[in-house]
Amino acid sequence: MLRAGSVVTCIACKGLLPSRMGVKFRVPLQKLHPLSRAIHHRYSANNNPQRPPHCSAARHYTSLSRLPMRPPKSRSGGHGYQQHRTFWVARLAARLLKLRYILLGSAVGGGYTAKKTYDEWKEMLPDMSEYTWIVPDFVWELSENIDLDKLASALPELEEIAKLLPDMEKIGENFTFLKSLLSSETTGESALRAPDVPPASAAMADSGDKQFKKSSDKEKVDQLQEELLRTQLKYQRMLERLEKENKELRKVVLQKDDKGIHQRKVKKSLIDMYSEVLDILSDYDSNYNTQDHLPRVVVVGDQSAGKTSVLEMIAQARIFPRGSGEMMTRSPVKVTLSEGPHHVAMFKDSSREFDLGKEEDLAALRHEIELRMRKSVKEGQTVSPETISLSVKGPGIQRMVLVDLPGVISTVTTGMAADTKETIFSISKAYMQNPNAIILCIQDGSVDAERSIVTDLVSQMDPQGKRTIFVLTKVDLAEKNLASPSRIQQIVEGKLFPMKALGYFAVVTGKGSPNESIDSIKDYEEDFFQNSRLLKDGMLKAHQVTTKNLSLAVSDCFWKMVRESVEQQADAFKASRFNLETEWKNNYPRLRELDRNELYEKAKNEILDEVISLSQVTPKHWESILQKKLWERVSTHVIENIYLPAAQTMNSGTFNTTVDIKLKQWTDKQLPHKALEVAWETLQEEFARFMAEYKGKDQDDIFDKLKEAVKDESIKRHKWNERAMDSLRVIQHNALEDRSITDKPQWDAAIQFMEETLQSRLKDTESVIADMVGPDWKQRWMSWKNRTPEQHTRNETKNELERLLKLHEDHTAYLANDEVTTVRKNLEARGVEVDPVLIKDTWHQLFRRHFLQKALLHCNLCRRGFYYYQRHFVDSELECNDVVLFWRIQRMLGITANTLRQQLTNTEVRRLEKNVKEVLEDFGEDNEKKVQLITGRRVQLAEDLKKVREIQEKLEAFIEALHKEK
């Protein structure tokens, strides 16, 4: 007897396992396992084992569907199918639980591979530390101004990010539900039919799962996109806020610079105080064409003579850009040397310190100097007279101020400006002609003395040699190349060159390699002079060699010159200050001494007050001037292209149709543009009117150029709102579509508007006719005027055409050809030769006058026609369609003026005020613009007084500190 539980179990297994897990094949039944035969054959009452062999579908069972080889025991009970507990679910769970080991191993291996890949990529990236000099100075200080707490608060919360992650609880519930489906057991007939259903049900389940997965993925993508947009908007707002704060901080810094607000006072060294005075004097000299006589060390020499190398040895750092044979020093470089605990360099206008002990900082400093030099050179020039100020501090550095000048050249090569040689000579002379300047003359010892150019220049500027120090460079090459060592002795004794000097020095500034360090150059220099025959044979004295002795001698000479001349310079500036103050008191006794920046701030406030006055214009004034200007702009088009052509028709319906078509075309194409042009011109005129009215109230005329420039630039930048034209077109179209005049006052206003317009046109037409026919008999007798032959011909033509109009008062606007011929023949009969073109031209003006006179009579009749219009009576004499047309035009003008007034007061005036503020800010940051717009002797005198006072105060402070040091 077959067991029902086994049959049910097999059917359940076949339903759970897809068909692809086994390959169907046909085998004889007797070759199957006895249990398989029991499963694959239906139960029958007779237990006959003898059955004919037949083919049956069999499967290769996997480990998930393994069945016991021993036949299961039957339960106690009757016949039929019996439930049988199986352990296939437990086996399935055991197989699934093995996945955790696979996942854990994959995670560990994947993490290791990812880390290894990241390290490989990181090694392939270039070292960006060498390019830190590209980043501007303010970026390094940005971290001090950024509030990290605010940035952290602006980032998404952890809970919001967690919402975007997959819901693990839902995944667990789905897995439990799937497990329950797999573990459920079916009974009865439905269980037996299960093998026939699985393909369709499985397909439906798979499609449902895929659809659910697609929908969930789509929801996740939408959530991620929304979160990305929210984050983007949040950072955009942060960026806008930071830009606004940066702009405000920049404005505060500019105001501090302009108003002279100083930071906390820091005690400065003596040399720093002196260098600051020289910087102020340098600006004062370049702006006012004056020369100070304060001492400084001027380094001059031929190109590639070693000037820069000598200066670097004194500064103990390779701070200047180098080039093999080409010009590298393109502008004067003022170097303030002082002693300090750390070897650093800093520009005058920057707070960044360059650590001269680090090679990357040295490279950045050299690059910055080269950039500043190239920036100072104007287009089409090779060198610049602008000075670059640099301070160098370090242990063992002698205190002094040196100025490195461009090397003197003998020939202008390709790529240089034609006046390069003369410019270098003029710059060198400007520094050397200072009677207190110390000239450090650098001469290349490896070239012939006869090729020297700078020695002649120095001998011209200091013929007695009282402030010149001669330096012979590249002595090692000179000793090696020169056959006669006595020639070097003649140079350092001052016998070879036609110049005199306070002292003569011989130095070695390295082997010529740009990569040599200062220490290696010093060692090489000391070794050379210790082993040199020049020193051993007595040709050179010990105090005349090495850059160390040179720097000590130059420093002593510098400070000696400073002590002797600084008080004299202070007295000179004191006298200059007295002269300037006296001139101010005599010429401007009741005015405060305001420099250019202070005057600009005053003018800025006045201009902003004038702009604010625009908001005080009354709406009635805006609308009246807008309506008046708009009608002046469009009246010709309305009369000539709309009213006159439509009025020639004799039918009321044709008149209205023509008017509607022409009004629609006019509204779609021209009218909105004309209206915006009128509004823009009105805004400009009102702005100019307020500035002119404000000018009369004790305004300083020194601001006229500035105010005019601000007004022009603001108007140039102002653009009308683009959406205004579309809305205005709709409003105008709706206003012109309305034909219903509701009350008598509107009717009377339209008639008055029409009469004024027609009378104005009639007056213009009569003036044209009077010019055509010349003076009448009264003017000829009273004013002694005569008609020209053409005027006489036109007068005869006019008289003939007037007769025609009297006969045909309802004549059309154009003459027929036979009528032209008749008029011409009548005139010829009276001896007047006339051209047909002249006849038509005269007819046009006469008919125009005739038509306008008739229209005025009709307009007068329509004064009593409102009742007929309101009741829609049909009366040919009182068809006042032209009155309705003028009412539509008048109403459109009023509505347009009201709309434009709202746009002006609500939007455009504020936008114009914003433009004015931006223009004022831009002009305030442009010093050249301020110098160009605020000019005059009064401004110049105030600027001179401010500078001279500042120089005198700093000189007195320096002299006081100098006396204390003594």
Swiss-Prot record:
Residues 473-476 are annotated as: G4 motif. Residues 189-217 are annotated as: Disordered. Disulfide bonds join 862-880. It is an enzyme of class 3 (hydrolase). The keyword Nucleotide-binding applies. Residues 777-787 dip into the membrane without crossing it. InterPro entries: Dynamin (IPR022812), Dynamin_GTPase (IPR001401), Dynamin_N (IPR045063), G_DYNAMIN_dom (IPR030381), OPA1_C (IPR045817), P-loop_NTPase (IPR027417). This is Dynamin-like GTPase OPA1, mitochondrial. It comes from Danio rerio (Zebrafish).
